[in-house]
Amino acid sequence: LDCMDDTASPAGARLVESFLARPERDLAEIQRRQACVEEFSRSPRAVEEVRETLRHGADLERILGRLRNRVVRPRELGGLRATVRGLPAIRQSLSELGKDFPAIQSLASRIELFEDLGDLLNRALEEELPAEIKLDVKGVGGRVIRAEYDKEFDRLRDLAGGGKRWILELEAGEREKTGISNLKVKYNGAFGYFIEVTKANLHLVPEHYVRKQTMTNAERYYTDELRTKEKEILNAEEQAVAKEQELFEEVVQRALEHADGLARVARALAEVDVFSSWGAIL
């Protein structure tokens, strides 16, 4: 069994298991498989190049399952993108081999390139993707949608980011005006934005500061200016999070339109993996 299952990918391993569990009875299909194995055995160097690409590819079958169930995560879509990016090289290698080997040429012809899908994923998704997309302003998750993909999303993200820059500028300005060198403007989910002053500096607090919360070693305040800006920032952040989720779901839906074709390619890649691994034994 170890010799039979020296595949480079999880999909290849599953296909070996399927072949062994349900032996083929159709003579033409048996002969096709034998021809592929025999032809791969005659080109070990080219075969290793293809198998190396398969080793570094994503588990396309698994991603497709999650895509169809609409539970796919950002990093998995990144895996789909990486696989689509690798398809031209795989098909080119197989096509070069196929000039002398018709069974391999038949495999190469089954490798679709999905140029439209690849373009979408390249334009829409960040290069480094988080495991989860951020679902609310307090939740965990990271950036998924690439800048310049959607103008409205860019506007909201810039507004939220600009607000945070304003907060840093406010902190520096308040330190200078009050003489409180360790004054801080902070944020937490329960209380929003606030100005924090240590107990040792309370005598320097201006009259227009409104007390918000008393801590053991500090007091927290807000100003009308800070409260107004807080609403602007949080509103932009909430809208940006919602927009990013919407755009991500749109990308998922458009990827789903290619699901049947991707499934065919996933099967072809699994066959390439299995037949090339068996060819290496001969």
Region annotations inferred by a language model:
Residues 1-282:
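Alpha-helical coupling/stalk and coiled-coil linker elements that connect catalytic or binding modules
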